[in-house]
Amino acid sequence: KNRLSAQNITILSPNKVFADYISNVLPELGEENIREMSFDMFAYRELRDTVSDCEDRCDQIEKELLDEKHAESCRKKQSIDFVLQLNEFVLGLEDRLMRFSDLKYKGMTKSERQLTEMFYYRFPDIPLLERMQAVMDYVVDEYETLIGRDLCDDEIEIVRGKFMKMYRSTDLYVLYNWFLKEYGYETLPQISYEKRFLKYEDVYPMLYLKYLLKSR
């Protein structure tokens, strides 16, 4: 209590009834009101860099009631088997997501083999979509020590571009589509970010995939 304030805490509410209860009971206990949001709003915010909008849960429920085939598809995506398939997909992704190449920038040079070994053996515990950044930080630090100065922001951005190009894709929407296609599910439309509207049944699977590939 002495270390945390209301500004440091967010309560994830399963529904509006719970949210209303919390907002009423805390002041009665002499506590400050704590920021709260629904699970769905939290998920939507976490995916806002990937899709422009997400379907509301009520709309999905309405569609399920009217379309049994759609309801069955939703149930599959809520199953343990679906989660296990996502886990399996990510395990295999390491071998085909990367496209290593020799790195050359001024006096900074690393061979394809050196970068491959660093990626798989020096930083194996770092999530896949953050691992190349760790490799880059290591290589840049080594180079800065060698030349006796820090690279400027413009130089760092050029180097980062060279490293990030070694990913075949870092777009979570694209990677989730790879998964859907590989496991025989209906894929999402291949459209630009501005037109991406994520169905509710895909929100939490995509969020789970994000947390498998990134720390947050």
What are these regions (language model features)?
Residues 2-216:
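Alpha-helical nucleic-acid-binding subdomain
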